[in-house]
Amino acid sequence: AKAGATEVVACDLDPLAIESCRANAALNGVELSYSLDFFSEEDRFDLIIVADVLYDRANLPLLDAFLTRGQEALVADSRVKDFQHPRYTRLGLLEACTWPDLAEPAEFREVSLYHAQRPT
């Protein structure tokens, strides 16, 4: 939202995560919309940004589902080192940290960023 997006929708199954998004938006002085159900959202997004969905193999079908709601998807993940998907390309490896510091092992501070685009 701070980068100029017309609309930003924060979506998570966990109501506590949504509350965290609300608090973060307030701290940053931006307005967001919120959703607890990704699949109830229409196909209208230019970009879907997700993090930490690869840790559970049951989430892998979401990778294709993201492209049913948005033109592009960015996936950030620090857990899975051998991720491969025909639509997703690894853009790079980034250093990250959680704030406040949750004392995560250093290996989880390396985040891989993947990109996919809906076929035209």
What name fits each language-model region?
Residues 1-120:
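S-adenosylmethionine-dependent methyltransferases
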